Amino acid sequence: MNRNFANFDYLLFLSVLALSVIGVLFIYSSGVNSDGILTSFEFQRQIIWVCTGIVLLFLVALYDYNKVKEYSVIIYAVGLLLLLYTPFFGKTVKGAKSWIGFGSFGIQPSEFMKIAYILFLAFYLDRSQKETELKRFIRAGVITLVPMFLILLQPDLGTASVYVPIFLVMCYVAGVKLQYLAFIFLVMFLGVAGLLYPMWEFYVTKEVSSLSRVLTDTRFSLLLFGVFFTVTALFLIGYFVFRKKYYYWLTFSFLILCGAMLICIAGLKVLKPYQMKRLIVFLDPSIDALDSGWNINQSMIAIGAGGLRGTRFLQGTQSHYKFLPEQPTDFIFSILSEEWGFIGGMIVFSLYIMIFRRIRKAALRCSDFYGKLVCIGMQVIFMYHFMINIGMVMGIMPVMGIPLLFLSYGGSSLWSAMISIGIVMGINLRQI
């Protein structure tokens, strides 16, 4: 280890540290009211979480990731057990039962499950390189769907959505055929479109079509799924009997429709009305002007008010007059943009870009396939959180409850982010 300690990534660590300090500053700012009085002490907890998170980062970095590889199945299984426990015995926070607690202490298992999932998926994709691509794709899909389903039961749509890009990117790097990945993408796209289309007609156009009635009626949806499934089975039989290529593509196409219908049916059962509304409110904030639409409008006002240089630290109006809800968590970038302006936003952007580049460099330097896949999975987590959260506060992405890692208030998200960075740094340390 000593001879490889020269591989310690100071730029990555300093970028993480800088973002964490900025996060504490603006969590403090969010707790100050219009009279300049500190009314919330969340920043003190965040300082403790940052300090303990840094300790976790170094402990994980110093532990040999190759040893973790052998226990990845156990780590994944423990994560699933915690996810199973949470919906029945967990705490309900903001409509989702995603916390388990002991007294005043609580953690969010779904945040740590992302790490367990990446470790196990990387382990499987590394060990299965001699298997057929279809078998690898199906098994990797099952590994992904199980935690996604358990997280949706909480229900926590934002965290569940993170698994899709991780799965697609890691499978692509592992050499899974593009047509299989295109299948997943199209199923997700059509499934989500099938969920949103009726909501769009109901809240925006005020005209409900026959298609929307079918998609929102469970009986009709199940009937339509049965029709698609029967047609898929017939085309599949035709392919095996006649070995014609067009039967293969017809089977592929109708299988996509079957998958999309399953997402629509499951979405109607699992997602609550306020979550469905959040998925379309960014297109027209007036749909839900007093809830999700209010958040988006106030966030954009705060960002616009900051201008180039901002209103100065602790001088923002949207935050200190409490116009902006969820200030220290989902919308912390709005406070930062108001008080530090465009320049402050660019500083944060630069720090995140540095993190992305350093993780990518660690992946490229890695000599073993398992470590490379783990680094890539971690990079996807950070990029997805960054893009969705920034898009959300700017009104160009749906409100999904995705925190801005290292900045947003919260111990579980911060600790999981620190552990993820620790894993990447540990992989980088052990390269020759």
Give the role of each language-model region.
Residues 1, 388-432:
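A juxtamembrane structural motif centered on a specific transmembrane helix
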Residues 1-15:
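Flexible extramembrane loops and terminal tails that flank transmembrane helices
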Residues 4-6, 136-137, 321-324, 366-367:
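Helix-boundary and loop/linker segments of multi-pass membrane transporters
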Residues 6, 20, 299:
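A short, flexible N-terminal coil/short beta segment enriched in small residues
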Residues 13-29, 33-291, 334-394, 419, ...:
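Hydrophobic alpha-helical transmembrane segments of multi-pass inner membrane proteins, especially
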Residues 103, 320, 405:
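Short pre-catalytic strand/loop immediately N-terminal to key active-site residues, enriched for Gly-Thr
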Residues 156-161, 311-316, 327-329, 400, ...:
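Transmembrane helix boundary and interhelical junction motifs in multipass membrane proteins
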Residues 281-332, 340-344:
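TM-adjacent membrane-interface loops and short helices in multi-pass inner/ER membrane proteins
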